[in-house]
């Protein structure tokens, strides 16, 4: 069965999802995009991407549509999700990537428009379930769950990083820092913002800010509820982020044992979600990597009961690939 997908919001994540769907060859079709921008601008930003480069096929704007290669995708411009013709278009799953409709009550308007399921591309509130692939995908119940959150890019990285470590040596407590690429929520120049640190110029500063990943981890790994805390450091790079997780382990271990646990996981049950590297990589090496987490083996440290592990992630491309994977999982159960 080909899963028919609608995208609501054609910003960074929406366009990354579109590109991932076009280049992966998965059994998934982007049927329509809803965004209030003009079609010519949307097509241009899809064709020319400052991080991913040129779209692999020719992209053109047509009346009410974008043509990418041999595929024509309908473009809608509707403010009210309930008014979208998802049912008429035969859409199975809507990927909600505006960043606006993150409450389940608002996201459910897509169902009123005829969609069967909605995946929120962000941490959500009042959702039926939050799913991080590789961690708790078995929690998804197609009979009970209609509004699904894919959590955040950081939670997808942290979830995999923490689960492998917890399964191997146990986690009593821990602290996570994500050194994160700047995002559209920050300012290019100093300007008012509700977070006074994010008010400062993103390209000139290391910006400490909050991260909900530690709290969200309890949604997908209930056994770690309340055991982790976290914050973020936004840095002047456009993509390529890294999670530093330091924990108190439940038992003694060694660097070698920890590395072996991740190597086995990456080659086995977590293949495609977790990658393992011993190369001395930096953030630009992660751009375009589809994994949720790239484990940096050479940064592993053990000191007494303290264990430090580090995982890289392309906060846009990796996350967008998980949205595709989750849409396939959800679609296969319809």
Swiss-Prot record:
InterPro entries: GlycerAld/Erythrose_P_DH, GlycerAld_3-P_DH_AS, GlycerAld_3-P_DH_cat, GlycerAld_3-P_DH_NAD(P)-bd, Glyceraldehyde-3-P_DH_1, NAD(P)-bd_dom_sf. One of its GO terms (cellular component) is cytoplasm. It comes from the Bacteria. Pfam families: Gp_dh_C, Gp_dh_N. NAD(+) binds at residues 12-13, 35, 79, 315. Pathway: Carbohydrate degradation; glycolysis; pyruvate from D-glyceraldehyde 3-phosphate: step 1/5. It is an enzyme of class 1 (oxidoreductase). Signal peptide: none annotated. The record marks 180 as: Activates thiol group during catalysis. One of its GO terms (biological process) is glucose metabolic process. It catalyses: D-glyceraldehyde 3-phosphate + phosphate + NAD(+) = (2R)-3-phospho-glyceroyl phosphate + NADH + H(+). Coiled coil: none annotated. D-glyceraldehyde 3-phosphate binds at residues 152-154, 183, 198, 211-212, 234. Its EC number is 1.2.1.12. This is Glyceraldehyde-3-phosphate dehydrogenase 1. Belongs to the glyceraldehyde-3-phosphate dehydrogenase family. Keywords: Cytoplasm, Glycolysis, NAD, Nucleotide-binding, Oxidoreductase. It is found in: Cytoplasm. NCBIfam families: GAPDH-I. Resistant to pentalenolactone. The active site is at 153 (nucleophile). Homotetramer. One of its GO terms (molecular function) is glyceraldehyde-3-phosphate dehydrogenase (NAD+) (phosphorylating) activity.
């Amino acid at each position: 069965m080909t899963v028919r997908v609608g995208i609501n919001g054609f910003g960074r994540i929406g366009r990354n999802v579109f590109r991932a769907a076009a280049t992966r060859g998965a059994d998934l079709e982007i049927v329509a995009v809803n965004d209030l921008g003009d079609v010519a601008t949307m097509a241009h930003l899809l064709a020319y991407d400052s991080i991913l480069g040129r779209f692999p096929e020719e992209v053109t704007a047509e009346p009410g549509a974008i043509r990418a290669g041999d595929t024509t995708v309908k473009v809608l411009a509707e403010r009210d999700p309930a008014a979208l013709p998802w049912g008429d278009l035969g859409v199975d799953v809507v990927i909600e990537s505006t960043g606006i409709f993150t409450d389940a009550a608002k996201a459910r308007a897509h169902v009123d428009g005829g969609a069967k399921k909605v995946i929120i591309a962000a941490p959500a509130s009042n959702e039926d379930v939050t799913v991080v692939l590789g961690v708790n995908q078995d929690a998804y119940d197609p009979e009970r769950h209609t509004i699904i959150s894919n959590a955040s890019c950081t939670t997808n990285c942290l979830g995999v990083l923490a689960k492998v470590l917890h399964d191997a040596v146990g986690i009593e407590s821990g602290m996570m820092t994500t050194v994160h690429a700047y995002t559209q929520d920050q300012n290019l120049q100093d300007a008012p913002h509700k977070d006074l640190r994010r008010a400062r110029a993103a390209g000139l500063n290391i910006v400490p800010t909050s991260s909900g990943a530690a709290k969200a981890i309890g949604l997908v790994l209930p056994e770690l509820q309340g055991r982790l805390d976290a914050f973020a450091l936004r840095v002047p790079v456009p993509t390529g982020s890294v999670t530093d997780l330091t924990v108190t382990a439940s038992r003694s271990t060694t660097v070698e044992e920890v590395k072996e646990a991740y190597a086995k996981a990456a080659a086995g049950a977590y293949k495609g979600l977790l990658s393992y590297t011993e190369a001395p990589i930096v953030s630009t090496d992660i751009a375009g990597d589809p994994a949720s987490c790239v484990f940096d083996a050479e940064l592993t440290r053990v000191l007494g009961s303290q264990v430090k592990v580090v995982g890289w992630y392309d906060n846009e491309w990796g996350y967008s690939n998980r949205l595709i994977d989750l849409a396939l999982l959800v679609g296969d159960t319809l």
